[in-house]
């Protein structure tokens, strides 16, 4: 373990996460998204085959946010399913937009 002392570790090996009460209606969504990140899932728009399903207007992406749309190489992701437009692992069509118009 990389943590040097027992007193620095979380009690019972559990890390508490508190979701703000204003987000309570989104608790299930947040938990599923966190689980997907923990399992190593990538966002749908990063899939190696995403250009078969999406058009991303890179010129309309906020400066510094382009990395959110980096396409993976085929060797970086194994695609067991078709592209899922309804996935919780896909950003909305105006996420990181410079002017609020769809990406």
Curated annotation (Swiss-Prot):
It is an enzyme of class 3 (hydrolase). Its EC number is 3.4.24.-. Its cofactor is Zn(2+). This is Astacin-like peptidase p16. Active against casein. Has a role as a digestive enzyme. Keywords: Hydrolase, Metal-binding, Metalloprotease, Protease, Zinc. GO terms for molecular function: metal ion binding; metalloendopeptidase activity. Residues 1-103 form the Peptidase M12A domain. It holds the Pfam family Astacin. One of its GO terms (biological process) is proteolysis.
């Amino acid at each position: 373990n990389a943590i040097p002392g027992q007193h620095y570790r979380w009690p019972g090996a559990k890390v508490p996460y508190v979701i703000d009460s204003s987000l309570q209606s989104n608790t299930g969504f947040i938990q599923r998204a966190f689980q997907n990140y923990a399992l190593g899932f990538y966002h749908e728009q990063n899939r190696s085959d995403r250009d078969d399903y999406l058009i991303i207007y890179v010129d309309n992406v906020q400066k510094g946010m382009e990395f959110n749309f980096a396409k993976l190489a085929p060797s970086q992701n194994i695609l067991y399913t078709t592209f899922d437009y309804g996935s919780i692992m896909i950003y909305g069509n105006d996420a990181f937009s410079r002017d609020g118009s769809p990406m």
